[in-house]
């Protein structure tokens, strides 16, 4: 299957409007960073009960979505779905962008910028989060190599092998990210090995959703039709991923209900948690 890639010219008013919008979002983000650094992490919702605040919600979402954004590239090279090959480079590029965004948000935890050097030179190998640093950097390296084999014609015959390594590594990355929460034995809301497969299932759905939004925007802005058949295939895949995520959520809560020590937490999150219960049923389950 011969694929001809054409770059977007980036000369239309809409393109510059998009750049301006993204620049505005970046400025708002920098303003939020300054506000948090000035007033402390308490403004993000963190306290003795809530171990991570709102920035961490976005960071974990971006990291998990980065793994799922590689879905299309994996289907093209690992599973032999040739119809997805023209869309594979965007998949890899978006995966890198999402991971970089998530890790940038996590940098806020370090406080002063110079503490990054300490984090890079001193590792606590008993910490699952420290081990995840290697998973994140490895994922970046594998995806860059994967993109190179796709974009360089003389390296195309290595694409299936590079895709396989990237696929295995993304599974390890999402498992490690879920284990950050699953190994928090002091927190009843987490403390479950089921969080690892749950994160994998959710990453497939989140990543594909973000990828589709970017793909549809790019194709619409550049006048390139996607086709109803391709969109229908993506819709079926998304339905399967959502069903898998819902399955693991149900199993997770049923497992907690089996153990008496988790009953208070389950009563809180499922019935008596106020806004948290509403967010769970309407946000996570219904939506």
Regions flagged by a language model, labelled:
Residues 4-10, 21-26, 81-83, 121, ...:
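Long, contiguous internal "core" modules enriched in hydrophobic/ aromatic residues
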Residues 8-20, 30-39, 80-88:
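Class II aminoacyl-tRNA synthetase catalytic cores and aaRS-like
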Residues 20-41, 104-110, 173-180:
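Alpha-helical transmembrane segments of multi-pass membrane proteins
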Residues 38-43, 114-118, 258-266:
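Peri-membrane helix termini and adjoining interfacial loops of integral membrane proteins
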Residues 41-53, 122, 268-271:
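Perimembrane loop-to-helix junctions flanking transmembrane segments
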Residues 50-117, 131, 135:
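Membrane helical hairpin/interfacial module
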Residues 126-130:
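Short, structured segments at the rim of ligand-binding sites
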Residues 33-49, 75-81, 217:
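Membrane-interface helix-loop junction between the first two transmembrane segments
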